[in-house]
Amino acid sequence: MPEYRSKTSTHGRNMAGARALWRATGVMETDFGKPIIAVANSFTQFVPGHVHLHNMGQLVAREIEKAGAIAKEFNTIAIDDGIAMGHSGMLYSLPSRDLIADSIEYMVNAHCADALVCISNCDKITPGMLIAAMRLNIPTIFVSGGPMEAGKVIGVANIQPERRLDLIDAMIESADDNVSNRQVEEVEQNACPTCGSCSGMFTANSMNCLTEALGLSLPGNGSYLATHVGRKELFLEAGRMIVEITKRYYEQNDETVLPRSIATKKAFENAMTMDIAMGGSTNTILHLLAVANEAGVDFKMADIDRLSRVVPCICKTAPNNHDYYMEDVHRAGGIFAILKELDKAGKLHTDVHTIHAPTLKDAIEKWDITNPENTRAIERFKAAPGGVRTTQAFSQNRMWKTLDLDREKGCIRDVAHAYSQDGGLAVLFGNIAERGCVVKTAGVDESILKFTGRARVFESQEDAVEGILGNQIVAGDIVIIRYEGPKGGPGMQEMLYPTSYLKSKGLGKACALLTDGRFSGGTSGLSIGHASPEAAEGGAIGLVHEGDTVEIDIPNRSIHLAISDEELAARRAEMEARGSKAWKPENRDRYVSAALRAYGAMATSADKGAVRDVAQIER
């Protein structure tokens, strides 16, 4: 029987000093002996997805205390990728994932906490917390802040029809010379109307949905709107459940509740299957690889490639389809409705554990909104947007009169009526990306699934943006942005502005973009990222010349630099001859702090999840 970790600092004569300090935090004499639950919050006033989390930690803490445990809250950092986008701030986004994981490890281990509640929401926070959960392997539950409501705009002078929109619309229209300042202002003011993570299937919502599929969060975690009063129950239930599973582990020796027992290879395959079926952010590939690495699970790019060939796309939301947003996914039954359709098609491992059900199969049946006996599920998924601008959680209680049960033409479809039988994400291989690169096929127009074009080479995102806005890019070009990988950036910037500006210039279906950097979950179009190995690690993307021909074939999962093997070898030899200047960008003026240089020195390429090269530490 495992012993409560917290006894290290709460029991024994020699811990009198530690107990004195515990008492000073509010621990009473009768509390000693109870499990100590760490509540890792990520509240910040910088991020709309986190601005409403201020009281969430204490909400969970009070419920933990009612259930018979001690709750202690602390905070992690949280970076808003949208605000950090398009300038040097984006260099810090991916590295913050490691800082978040480390900070949770430090706090939990330093204070000998027995279990963990992770209150997350946005892009790097959820994966950072997942990495920490796998590293610590103590009872853990995730509960996120929830998605924001979709924006809505009537149109200039009420002439245009009403349409829903999101952050990406503001970015695209701001760079379109055909859009007036008044129109841009209207979109800007209405794109993000409430607190919560951005309203489409971007990285934040993708990751929160994946925690459901992994089995580490409650049903509705990824789709229940931040503003809805019903979401409060997720936080309260998380507080009760963490105490239950903590006691099951420490008092009943039930190891099935531990993160590594839940997040097995089968669970990672389930999560990736769900992500492919939804056409989620390509960032999820990066993060799942990193989380699996921390969990000691052999889950690689080859597994993702295998799944991408057999999983259909059965749910397509913004930015890939502006008919649907996360609020529509929720109305259609949320993640468990998607999992049900995938299970019916034999695409899931349903014998895996979850924190809230003995098996995933049990959970799918319990949360099936098509079963009239599941009244709790039906009530939960009727939660609707309130349509009122607010930064307050639980501020409205509007409910849909009906659910979206249309599995032929609705938001979530059965496999027979899938948007495409080929999934929403794909891994491409070729001489320009020997260890793979990724593309969100759900966002690629069918007319350009095969594309051959002229390489236009840029050695920084800034130069690429300047080239696009300066009308240097024309139809048929393939924009190559290199030295933006985890090591080369350093920090692996997102390329949302270049892809958005290509759309602004009317080139969204006429050009492609290839990078060793990554993309925002809001990206769509023929945008191929994570080219591995990256240029700074000796990848062939660093050997592309201006004007080269690049051939992209998504159906056959290939990407090819159209030069001979001999020419490629000659270019590599020429690069190596540059000595200390080899595999570094030419003429790039970028300040890189010591903190970022330290990150880059230990970072691996994207095919490994951009995790630290631990071998360097152990030398």
Curated annotation (Swiss-Prot):
So, what pathway does this thing act in?
Answer: Amino-acid biosynthesis; L-isoleucine biosynthesis; L-isoleucine from 2-oxobutanoate: step 3/4; Amino-acid biosynthesis; L-valine biosynthesis; L-valine from pyruvate: step 3/4
Name the GO terms of the biological process aspect.
isoleucine biosynthetic process; L-valine biosynthetic process
Query: What's one Pfam family here?
Result: ILV_EDD_C
Q: Which InterPro entries match?
A: Dihydro-acid_dehy_C (IPR042096), DihydroxyA_deHydtase (IPR004404), DiOHA_6PGluconate_deHydtase_CS (IPR020558), ILV_EDD_C (IPR056740), ILV_EDD_N (IPR000581), IlvD/EDD_N (IPR037237)
**Residues modified to N6-carboxylysine:** 124
Q: Name one GO molecular function term.
A: dihydroxy-acid dehydratase activity
Q: Any idea of its EC number? A: 4.2.1.9
> Which PROSITE patterns does its entry note?
ILVD_EDD_1, ILVD_EDD_2
Residue numbers binding [2Fe-2S] cluster: 122, 198
Disulphide linkage map: none
Which SUPFAM superfamilies does this chain map to? IlvD/EDD N-terminal domain-like (SSF143975), LeuD/IlvD-like (SSF52016)
Q: Which residues bind Mg(2+)?
A: 81, 123-124, 494
Catalyzed reactions = (2R)-2,3-dihydroxy-3-methylbutanoate = 3-methyl-2-oxobutanoate + H2O; (2R,3R)-2,3-dihydroxy-3-methylpentanoate = (S)-3-methyl-2-oxopentanoate + H2O
- Free-text remark on how the cofactor is bound: Binds 1 [2Fe-2S] cluster per subunit. This cluster acts as a Lewis acid cofactor.
What are the alphabetically sorted keywords of the record?
A: 2Fe-2S, Amino-acid biosynthesis, Branched-chain amino acid biosynthesis, Iron, Iron-sulfur, Lyase, Magnesium, Metal-binding
State the similarity comment: Belongs to the IlvD/Edd family.
- The name this protein carries in UniProt is Dihydroxy-acid dehydratase
